[in-house]
């Protein structure tokens, strides 16, 4: 996991209200371009400390430190002396989340592999062909045009070309191993669901902020075409 890149910037977002000496009098508006930009800054910076998985009580403490820092109040602790402890907490919680996701993924894959009509590859991918295609099968070196939707095992969608309304085109050997192997089992015009073990997806690092460490992933894929290189 990357070292914390330091909290002077990362903490600066959890509560705009906490930065003010006055209590908030009305809901925060996010309508103008400037308001949207500063709101986005908050979201982006909060993602940098997502690994802490703060409890409500811890969030109050962070907000207190944030408000004191913004308002130039004297800190009640030595922030520099707390760096090592914060790093220790972040790493421990990151590992705990990874271990939990790994165990849940193993259970999910085991259950999925026992369903009727699926195939489990030697590498551990569980594939269900929901519509048989009639065209050619791609090779790993081919570019493919696909529609897809990716979900965590709790059903949360983290990426979807379907929602964007635009198919994706990419080299099949330039994506996660689960895709490289799984899509090669499909024919053009076909649809399939791929259940990807973490080691064939984004592994122990995940893909922050949308994919946690050691996450088993589910993809619904439609193979639209094999794209020929431009001459």
Feature names for model-found ranges:
Residues 3-6, 19-231:
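Cross-family detector of peptidyl-prolyl cis-trans isomerase
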Residues 13-16:
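Bacterial Sec-type N-terminal signal peptides, specifically the leucine/valine-rich hydrophobic h-region
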